């Protein structure tokens, strides 16, 4: 009866409201009018599933929509099914109040396929099924969250992303390089300064060493020079004495204070000196310490001094111990040594003549009188 009234356009008889509410075959009935609220879980799903082929599949970890688990399992042939009517006009003469929305069932069936019914007397609009879209829609689905908007937990909001972190590391690296260069330059500068100080100290030490060597060489050279001067002077005086003796002079005379004997002059000193000082005095006066070559000469000298004084002779063994020689280098041919002399006690290397004309060895550094000998001058 409900269908008859619906076809003829008459209002529903009383009692049909409860029958419609109790109609368990609600999902197989004619789609509701536009002024009725959609069935929970069906209209929005159809609107969202219009672009099902072009939509991006949801994340695997997203929970399923309420009441759609069994629909996804049952709607395997959703792409080949006919979409339901969406723009059906309301029934003529129907003034029934809008139905309250029913609670969503746990198990819902897919919507009816797009199939026209033989309804006479109704002004139904033409229903067109949209062709399936084969193109891929690149626009993100409204239910699918955007990848750009997904927050990443390991990135800090203040860091500004990986680019900002990379810039920060670049800044740290630049600061490290600049610091390393500065420390390297500072170390090089300190090393150069220390090197210059060490080189300056080395030059000063080299200069001091050179000065010390020069002084030592100068002192040694000065001592050698003095020795050479003394030797040259002695040789010169000896040459002059010999030259004067060779000259043919008419009158042979001796200097004042000198005693002549067989063409020679002898000087007996009134003061005392060491052996070296006495030798130097004789050389300065163109003479030498007395050299005895004969008994007559020895007797003249022993008698001439006539006093208990001890005089230096020109005899010594400095070159070799025990080898006594005169100043002219000749060995001793006549010996007038006292008994047990020479004994070389206390480094006694020079010879003296005592009061009786005997010889004795004495240290060259002691002081006593001396006798000089030279040839007579004309």
UniProtKB/Swiss-Prot annotation:
Biased composition (Pro residues): 86-101
Bilayer disposition of the protein: Single-pass type II membrane protein
Entry keyword Kinase: no
InterPro entries per the UniProt record, alphabetical: C-type_lectin-like (IPR001304), C-type_lectin-like/link_sf (IPR016186), C-type_lectin/snaclec_domain (IPR050111), C-type_lectin_CS (IPR018378), CD209-like_CTLD (IPR033989), CTDL_fold (IPR016187)
Any one annotated GO CC term: external side of plasma membrane
Region feature Disordered, mapped onto this chain: 1-119
Keywords, ordered alphabetically: Calcium, Disulfide bond, Glycoprotein, Lectin, Mannose-binding, Membrane, Metal-binding, Receptor, Signal-anchor, Transmembrane, Transmembrane helix
Record localization: Membrane
Main location: membrane
Transmembrane segments: 173-193
Any matching Pfam family: Lectin_C
Keyword Flavoprotein: no
Disulfide bonds: 254-265, 282-372, 350-364
Function: Cell surface receptor which may be involved in carbohydrate-mediated communication between cells in the germinal center. Binds glycans with terminal alpha-linked mannose or fucose residues.
Subunit structure: Oligomer; disulfide-linked.
Protein name: C-type lectin domain family 17, member A
Protein's organism: Homo sapiens
């Amino acid at each position: 009866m409900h269908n008859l009234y619906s076809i003829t356009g008459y209002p529903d008889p009383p009692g049909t409201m409860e029958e419609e509410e109790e109609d368990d075959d609600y999902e197989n009935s004619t789609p509701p009018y536009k002024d009725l609220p959609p069935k929970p879980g069906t209209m929005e799903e159809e609107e969202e599933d219009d672009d099902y082929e072009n939509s991006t599949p949801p994340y695997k970890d997203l929970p399923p929509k309420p009441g759609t688990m069994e629909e996804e399992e049952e709607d395997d042939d959703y792409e080949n099914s006919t979409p339901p009517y969406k723009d059906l006009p309301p029934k003529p003469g129907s003034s029934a109040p809008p139905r309250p929305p029913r609670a969503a069932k746990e198990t819902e069936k897919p919507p009816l396929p797009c199939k026209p019914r033989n309804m006479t007397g109704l002004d139904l609009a033409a229903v067109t099924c949209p062709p399936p879209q084969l193109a891929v829609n690149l626009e993100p689905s409204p239910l699918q969250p955007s990848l750009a908007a997904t927050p990443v937990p390991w990135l800090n909001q203040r860091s500004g992303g990986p680019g900002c972190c990379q810039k920060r590391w670049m800044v740290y690296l630049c600061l490290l390089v600049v610091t390393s260069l500065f420390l390297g330059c500072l170390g090089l500068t300190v090393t150069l300064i220390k090197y210059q100080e060490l080189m300056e100290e080395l030059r000063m030490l080299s200069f001091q060493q050179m000065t010390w060597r020069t002084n030592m060489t100068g002192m040694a050279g000065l001592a050698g020079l003095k020795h050479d001067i003394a030797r040259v002077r002695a040789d010169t005086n000896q040459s002059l004495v010999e030259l004067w003796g060779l000259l043919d002079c008419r009158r042979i005379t001796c200097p004042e204070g000198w005693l002549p004997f067989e063409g020679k002059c002898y000087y007996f000193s009134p003061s005392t000196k060491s052996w070296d000082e006495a030798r130097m005095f004789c050389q300065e006066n163109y003479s030498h310490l007395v050299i005895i070559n004969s008994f007559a000469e020895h007797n003249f000298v022993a008698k001439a001094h006539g006093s208990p004084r001890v005089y230096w002779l020109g005899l010594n063994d400095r070159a070799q111990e025990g080898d006594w020689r005169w100043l002219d280098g000749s060995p001793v041919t006549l010996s007038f040594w006292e008994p047990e002399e020479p004994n070389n006690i206390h480094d006694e290397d020079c010879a003296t003549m005592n009061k009786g004309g005997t010889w004795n060895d004495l240290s060259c550094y002691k002081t006593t009188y001396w006798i000089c000998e030279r040839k007579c001058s004309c």
